[in-house]
């Protein structure tokens, strides 16, 4: 008896269904590194148009977390897809190396008692250790880049170029020194940049304090009254009692309506809209009378006494005054608030600051000298109470600025700092704010809402405090006049001389510099080196100049910056400002892409205390990095990205669908040589030509749309749908009969293999930017061998087909697919009640509208192959309808179709006539399916 299983083309796949990614990926990485794939790619891509994604440097401290992984994976997908699109897309990874967190860690490890040069040396060593750890993890994620030559903000050349960027901004006229209130962290002992501030709830005392008017005659006139009997008070409300010793004025809103109210305390001035609530706080319900009303502009330049100090307090008009809460009058301490500073500056009031750099009151401050501002709060609360000027006291929970590192409350404190001015006219007559807002207009945003967010932040941001009183940072290499505080007139030339020294020896070249090496003897008497370092956001914000503009393989401006949504106030903004404030005069990027933060499946932030942290190291060790990459790509990054073990298991199912599809494709291509066996498109079976159209359209959607627009979640959805619907549930399902049962080298089978070859090459290229390990594993089989890489190739080129023929082909097969779905649905009840096992056991009678019926009948005897039934008949009717029944034919042992011609050919008693021809004759021919 013949064993017909040996006559079918069931081939083993060289691409296993189990990926075993966690085990295989490290070995592949080692091999790629040894082959110098990144370097080879640079040679291959030489001369192509450039695409530059500039890496926002992660901070060199601690292991990478899942947010880092998302960021680097998204960048890598872009670099790979741009490379395959025909660009030269080098990727230079970087690290942010200076700053307080490293200082804190070094102090923990080694203490504080050491020479500053040794301290900086230890900071440099610590940063290098952290970089080595993080680099290993980034490489493990499959991120392609120049890992042997990354940029570090602590590289001598980068430090030197950061100093040069400072020189650029100095020459542009935006740098100035001022004693302004800035966000100050008592734990850091330093001012903070806007990006280093976070807001969380804090409970604070809320008090109403009365300021006695000096001249009630002038007050009466402001309210249009002939006179006022008794005492009168302006009442303020504040949640920062510790600032009252620095109170130098009270601000009223020029257009706000104020009432003069007679109360048991005396005459009180309160905003009309807030008076009722204020009087309730003071417990005044009886003996109240509204005497008059006026607007805030009439109160300007009235004078009061301080509620507990001997100090004259003028009434000012301030635009910052609102009637949202409080009393409508604002106690004004220019040393402790930006708006306070601005209004006092307008009136020429000289700033008084009673709080030192440790957050303690100076010795001249009565009662609270030597106390920290937080210790002093209860003492200061007693003070106006003793003078009879405390009207109400309570607690309030409100959003308050905290240090992002120490999580402790900040204070506004006036300090001598260096600023980049937002509204100061530069050497070109333009303000930095105007330039930056124009630069926002010239930038493309992904997602689009990023534009409004960045624009509003730039519109509202204060001047940028760029100086820091720290040790581990790029120095502000200026010489400052000892008496006037002015910069040396030759600062630009001196900066360049210092930069040249730093390029040779690093920042220590400045810290160890004797000023006599660069200044004349006379200048040495009058000028000192500035001891400040630069804000680390200036370091990273200057990398477009220190890295992108300097490295030969890169081009300025970068095409794309890609970071988390917090970087609108961080790196995106600092880079924008340095770009606009320098001679470049524009943003250093053309596009900005923002991704959300990673949360758990319930939308909660990752937290060790909750126990919901998903570490990337755990994911790639258990599932493989390709699963993590597929998760990142399949999630809409414009919002929060949810991750958990359950979510990763679902992602694994999608991966399995793609992998199983590839395994099937490779199995059926294992005896196919595209040079010798390919069938010209015009001679291919019709459904094979249709499948090529589907594959080409998929490639067009991804290569022409989703990848260039960074819509990776749509790309993944489309790939999985193509594998499961177009291939798995339709084309490959139909194709199995022809692949397995026709002669191995028949035109019918070679036509199918020709289609599969094009589909497979295209599919591997399409998945490779996302599934970089799986893509390379597959390319080893269908590409040019082990030394070849999928990255060395651009998108697949399909055989050409004219538009009219394609449109007709798609229309026809769309109708056939619709009919097939109806047939499948009609057979389902027969399967459910065990009348038939598979659809091949059934016959179908189809009623269809005329056009569809024409398409179906055009397939002739091959219609049954397209519908996966043993027999199909078609007749014309108004609507699509299918009647299915069990076939009365006999099952062919070889093809499993049920026919009435099993055993019709002598010597082939258990197989159908078609199979007999395929085994012993010339083989069947196919035209349609």
UniProtKB/Swiss-Prot annotation:
ATP binds at residue 608. Zn(2+) binds at residues 892, 895, 912, 915. It is found in: Cytoplasm. The keyword Ligase applies. L-isoleucyl-5'-AMP binds at residue 563. Its cofactor is Zn(2+). A motif ('KMSKS' region) lies at residues 605-609. Pfam families: Anticodon_1 (PF08264), tRNA-synt_1 (PF00133), zf-FPG_IleRS (PF06827). GO terms for molecular function: aminoacyl-tRNA deacylase activity; ATP binding; isoleucine-tRNA ligase activity; tRNA binding; zinc ion binding. Keywords: Aminoacyl-tRNA synthetase, ATP-binding, Cytoplasm, Ligase, Metal-binding, Nucleotide-binding, Protein biosynthesis, Zinc. It catalyses: tRNA(Ile) + L-isoleucine + ATP = L-isoleucyl-tRNA(Ile) + AMP + diphosphate. Its main location: cytoplasm. Binds 1 zinc ion per subunit. GO terms for biological process: isoleucyl-tRNA aminoacylation. It comes from the Bacteria. Its EC number is 6.1.1.5. A motif ('HIGH' region) lies at residues 58-68. One of its GO terms (cellular component) is cytosol. Monomer. HAMAP family: Ile_tRNA_synth_type1. Belongs to the class-I aminoacyl-tRNA synthetase family. IleS type 1 subfamily. IleRS has two distinct active sites: one for aminoacylation and one for editing. The misactivated valine is translocated from the active site to the editing site, which sterically excludes the correctly activated isoleucine. The single editing site contains two valyl binding pockets, one specific for each substrate (Val-AMP or Val-tRNA(Ile)). NCBIfam families: ileS. PANTHER family: ISOLEUCINE--TRNA LIGASE, MITOCHONDRIAL, SOLEUCYL-TRNA SYNTHETASE. Catalyzes the attachment of isoleucine to tRNA(Ile). As IleRS can inadvertently accommodate and process structurally similar amino acids such as valine, to avoid such errors it has two additional distinct tRNA(Ile)-dependent editing activities. One activity is designated as 'pretransfer' editing and involves the hydrolysis of activated Val-AMP. The other activity is designated 'posttransfer' editing and involves deacylation of mischarged Val-tRNA(Ile). This is Isoleucine--tRNA ligase.
């Amino acid at each position: 008896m013949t064993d017909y299983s040996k006559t079918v083309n069931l081939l083993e796949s060289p691409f296993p269904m189990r990926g075993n990614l966690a085990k295989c990926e490290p070995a592949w990485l080692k091999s790629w590194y040894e082959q110098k794939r990144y370097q080879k790619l640079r040679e291959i891509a030489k001369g192509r148009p450039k695409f530059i994604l500039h890496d926002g440097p992660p901070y060199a401290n601690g292991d990478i977390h899942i947010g880092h992984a998302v960021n680097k994976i998204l960048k890598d997908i872009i670099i790979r897809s741009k490379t395959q699109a025909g660009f030269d897309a080098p990727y230079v990874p970087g690290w942010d190396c200076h700053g307080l967190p490293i200082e804190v860690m070094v102090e923990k490890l080694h203490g504080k008692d050491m020479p500053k040069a040794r301290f900086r040396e230890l900071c440099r060593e610590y940063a290098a250790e952290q970089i080595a750890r993080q680099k290993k993890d980034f490489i493990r994620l499959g991120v392609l880049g120049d890992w042997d030559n990354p940029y570090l903000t602590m590289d001598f050349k980068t430090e030197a170029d950061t100093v040069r960027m400072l020189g650029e901004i100095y020459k542009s006229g935006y740098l100035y020194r001022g004693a302004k209130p800035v966000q100050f962290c008592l734990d850091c002992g330093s001012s903070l940049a806007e990006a280093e501030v976070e807001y969380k709830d804090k409970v604070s005392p809320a008090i109403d304090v009365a300021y006695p008017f000096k001249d009630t005659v002038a007050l009466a006139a402001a309210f249009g009254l002939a006179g006022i009997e008794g005492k009168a008070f302006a009442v303020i409300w504040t949640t920062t009692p510790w600032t009252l010793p620095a109170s130098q004025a009270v601000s009223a809103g020029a257009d706000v309506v104020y009432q003069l109210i007679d109360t048991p305390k005396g005459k009180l001035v309160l905003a009309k809209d807030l008076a009722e609530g204020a009087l309730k706080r003071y417990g005044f319900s009886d003996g109240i009378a509204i005497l008059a009303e006026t607007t805030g502009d009439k109160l300007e330049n009235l004078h009061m006494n301080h509620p507990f100090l001997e100090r004259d307090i003028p009434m000012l008009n301030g635009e910052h005054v609102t009637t949202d809460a409080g009393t409508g009058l604002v106690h004004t301490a220019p040393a402790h608030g930006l708006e306070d500073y601005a209004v006092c500056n307008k009136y020429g009031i000289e700033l008084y600051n009673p709080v030192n750099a440790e957050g303690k009151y100076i010795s001249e401050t009565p009662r609270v000298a030597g106390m920290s501002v937080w210790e002093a709060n209860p003492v200061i609360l007693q003070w106006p109470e003793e003078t009879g000027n405390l009207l109400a006291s309570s607690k309030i929970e409100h959003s308050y600025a905290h240090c992002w590192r120490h999580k402790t409350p900040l204070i506004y404190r006036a300090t001598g700092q260096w600023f980049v001015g937002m509204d100061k006219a530069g050497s070109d007559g333009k303000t930095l704010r105007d330039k930056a807002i124009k630069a926002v207009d010239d930038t493309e945003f992904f997602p689009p809402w990023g534009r409004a967010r960045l624009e509003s932040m730039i519109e509202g941001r204060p001047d940028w405090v760029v100086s820091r009183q720290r040790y581990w940072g790029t120095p502000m290499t200026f010489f400052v006049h000892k008496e006037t505080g002015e910069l040396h007139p030759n600062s630009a030339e001196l900066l360049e001389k210092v930069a040249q020294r730093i390029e040779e020896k690093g920042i220590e070249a400045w810290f160890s510099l004797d000023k006599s090496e660069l200044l004349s003897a006379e200048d040495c008497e009058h000028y000192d080196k500035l001891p400040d370092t630069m804000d680390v956001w200036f370091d990273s914000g200057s990398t477009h100049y220190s890295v992108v503009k300097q490295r030969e393989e890169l081009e300025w401006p970068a095409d794309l910056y890609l970071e988390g949504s917090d970087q609108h106030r961080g790196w995106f903004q600092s880079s924008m400002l340095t770009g606009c404030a320098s001679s470049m005069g524009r943003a250093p990027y053309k596009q900005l892409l923002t991704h959300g933060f990673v949360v758990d499946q319930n939308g909660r932030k990752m937290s060790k205390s909750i126990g919901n942290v998903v570490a990337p190291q755990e994911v790639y060790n258990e599932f493989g990095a390709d699963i993590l990459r597929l998760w990142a790509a399949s999630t809409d990054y414009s919002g929060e990205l949810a991750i958990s073990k359950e979510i990763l298991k679902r992602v694994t199912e999608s991966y399995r669908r793609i992998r199983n599809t590839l395994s099937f494709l490779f199995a059926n291509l294992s005896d196919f040589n595209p040079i010798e066996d390919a069938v010209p498109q015009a001679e291919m079976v019709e459904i094979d030509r249709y499948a090529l159209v589907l594959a080409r359209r998929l490639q067009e959607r991804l290569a022409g749309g989703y990848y260039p627009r960074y819509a990776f979640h749509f790309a993944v959805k489309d790939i999985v749908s193509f594998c499961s619907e177009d291939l798995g549930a339709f084309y490959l399902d139909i194709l199995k009969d022809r692949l397995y049962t026709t002669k191995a080298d028949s035109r019918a089978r070679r036509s199918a293999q020709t289609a599969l070859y094009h589909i497979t090459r295209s599919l591997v290229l399409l998945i490779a930017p996302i599934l970089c390990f799986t893509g390379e594993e597959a390319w080893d089989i269908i590409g040019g061998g082990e030394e070849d890489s999928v990255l060395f190739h651009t998108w697949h080129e399909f055989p050409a087909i004219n538009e009219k023929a394609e449109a007709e082909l798609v229309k026809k097969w769309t109708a056939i697919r619709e009919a097939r779905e109806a047939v499948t649905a009609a057979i389902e009840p027969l399967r459910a009640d065990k009348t038939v096992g598979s659809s091949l056991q059934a016959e179908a009678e189809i009623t269809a509208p005329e056009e569809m019926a024409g398409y179906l009948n055009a397939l002739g005897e091959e219609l049954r192959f397209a519908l996966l039934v043993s027999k199909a008949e078609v007749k014309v009717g108004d609507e699509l309808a299918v009647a299915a029944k069990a076939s009365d034919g006999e099952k062919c042992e070889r093809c499993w179709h049920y026919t009435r011609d099993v055993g019709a050919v002598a010597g082939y008693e258990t197989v159908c006539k078609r199979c007999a021809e395929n085994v012993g004759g010339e083989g069947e021919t196919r035209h349609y399916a």
